[in-house]
Amino acid sequence: MLPDWSPAYLRLSNGFAGGVGCSFQELCGAAAGAVMVIGALFGREDLQPDEEAQRIACRYRERFLETFGETRCAPLRQNVVKVEGGLGSCAVVCERAAMVLLELLSEEGLAI
């Protein structure tokens, strides 16, 4: 999906894990990673105004909220992952968050 895959992509996103540095207080790392992918695919390459990536990122956030009911790490862990009958693992959140992203990218006309 991303051109010229590089291990640097993983390094760039590493600090988002656990709601930013495992603080569990900020945006879910899976959501942050998806927004990074959106930026890589649709973001601007200079300082000129460009709303495409912003529009798609906003749509992604809305879909993430519809799916999980929250975007912040701590409430997600408490109410979606660790609750009895919940997902049980952040890996499952990551998987579902990626599926939400792939569906959205398909709607945007990106061949996957």
Explain the meaning of each model-derived region.
Residues 8-15, 30-33, 59:
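Non-catalytic alpha-helical scaffold/packing segments enriched in small hydrophobic residues
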Residues 22-36:
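Conserved phosphate/anionic-ligand binding catalytic regions in large, soluble enzymes, centered on
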Residues 1-12, 38-56:
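Phosphate-handling active-site elements
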Residues 1-16, 67-75:
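Acidic-glycine-rich active-site phosphate/pyrophosphate-binding loop
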Residues 17-26, 81-86:
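A short glycine/serine-rich beta->alpha loop
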Residues 52-112:
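C-terminal binding/interaction regions
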Residues 35-38, 81-83:
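Iron-sulfur (Fe-S) cluster-binding segments and ferredoxin-like electron-carrier domains
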